Amino acid sequence: MADVDKLNIDSIIQRLLEVRGSKPGKNVQLQENEIRGLCLKSREIFLSQPILLELEAPLKICGDIHGQYYDLLRLFEYGGFPPESNYLFLGDYVDRGKQSLETICLLLAYKIKYPENFFLLRGNHECASINRIYGFYDECKRRYNIKLWKTFTDCFNCLPIAAIVDEKIFCCHGGLSPDLQSMEQIRRIMRPTDVPDQGLLCDLLWSDPDKDVLGWGENDRGVSFTFGAEVVAKFLHKHDLDLICRAHQVVEDGYEFFAKRQLVTLFSAPNYCGEFDNAGAMMSVDETLMCSFQILKPAEKKKPNASRPVTPPRGMITKQAKK
């Protein structure tokens, strides 16, 4: 554990933030042992805290980042760099974008520095069979080595899965599950764990709302389900909640309501992959649980690139990853 003992968090954060004024794309190359230390120390903290977090407002909630490091820095400029504000991120830190390493390293560093004020949930891309395919593995291999990617996997397998803010706002990456009857079921999930192909943990990270579905439907992703407005209303009523806050889908304005404002989707990576013309958003929850949105506008419209592959069915990915 020598990597953890001599970890200089302040120096790491300082170097990661030094590129703030630079042209987007400039890398920060931390030492391999520093990154390993970030993974090991944050993993310890994740395991010392509940898998279902119970948080208090005020805080700011962010959706997918996907390696768009300079947009993450813009989010902090808008919302206030920690510890100025408390944060909850809803997962999908890596893959797709060009700087997954800087992104996840800054987030883990802030988790270590401010463990009671900075929170990270697991997204479906914090899973080896997914980020093996969609960019993070290749970035680790190119800039460091495969062993470091495996160290991240061990860390991701310990991330919390969901959070409840002031007993009223239920937060997770994907959405609801037909298997979820009691919050105790989430609390009983043992870590470390991979993300299974089906069941409660899979659904919390993979499911999507769908206005055209009554009850539960098939998901075009080939994994998990879709759920309709009535499912949302029943869930909130049963658990005495006001709102579901989730990420997992690109939405044009960075945030989008569903089911009469009983669910909100947040997406925090503007111009996603350089191919979408979407804004990014961050939701601020004040002490009275009033929610407002800060928007990161997209850059000037670019020609969409039709060549980006969609996420294929889960089974297919798993098979590819085993090669």
Curated annotation (Swiss-Prot):
InterPro entries: Calcineurin-like_PHP_ApaH, Metallo-depent_PP-like, PP1_catalytic_subunit, Ser/Thr-sp_prot-phosphatase, STPPase_N
Disordered: annotated span: 300-323
Amino-acid positions noted as binding Mn(2+) 1 in the UniProt annotation, renumbered to this chain: D64, H66, D92
EC number(s) per entry: 3.1.3.16
Binding site for Mn(2+) 2: D92, N124, H173, H248
Cofactor(s) the protein requires to work: Mn(2+)
Gene3D superfamilies for this protein: 3.60.21.10
UniProt GO BP: cell division; glycogen metabolic process; mitotic nuclear membrane reassembly; protein dephosphorylation
Cofactor binding note from Swiss-Prot or TrEMBL: Binds 2 manganese ions per subunit.
Record keywords, A-Z: Carbohydrate metabolism, Cell cycle, Cell division, Centromere, Chromosome, Cytoplasm, Glycogen metabolism, Hydrolase, Kinetochore, Manganese, Membrane, Metal-binding, Mitochondrion, Mitosis, Nucleus, Protein phosphatase
Subcellular compartments: Cytoplasm; Nucleus; Nucleus, Nucleolus; Cleavage furrow
Gene Ontology cellular-component terms listed: cleavage furrow; cytoplasm; kinetochore; membrane; midbody; mitochondrion; nuclear speck; nucleolus
Catalytic residues in the record: H125
A single MF term (Gene Ontology): protein serine/threonine phosphatase activity
Protein's job: Protein phosphatase that associates with over 200 regulatory proteins to form highly specific holoenzymes which dephosphorylate hundreds of biological targets. Protein phosphatase 1 (PP1) is essential for cell division, and participates in the regulation of glycogen metabolism, muscle contractility and protein synthesis. Promotes nuclear envelope reassembly by targeting nuclear membrane vesicles to chromatin at the end of mitosis. Acts by dephosphorylating membrane proteins such as lamin B receptor (lbr) to regulate the binding of membrane proteins to chromatin.
The family this protein is said to belong to: Belongs to the PPP phosphatase family. PP-1 subfamily.
Record's subunit section: PP1 comprises a catalytic subunit, ppp1c1, ppp1cb or ppp1cc, which is folded into its native form by inhibitor 2 and glycogen synthetase kinase 3, and then is complexed to one or several targeting or regulatory subunits.
Name under which the protein is recorded: Serine/threonine-protein phosphatase PP1-gamma catalytic subunit A
Organism the protein comes from: Xenopus laevis (African clawed frog)
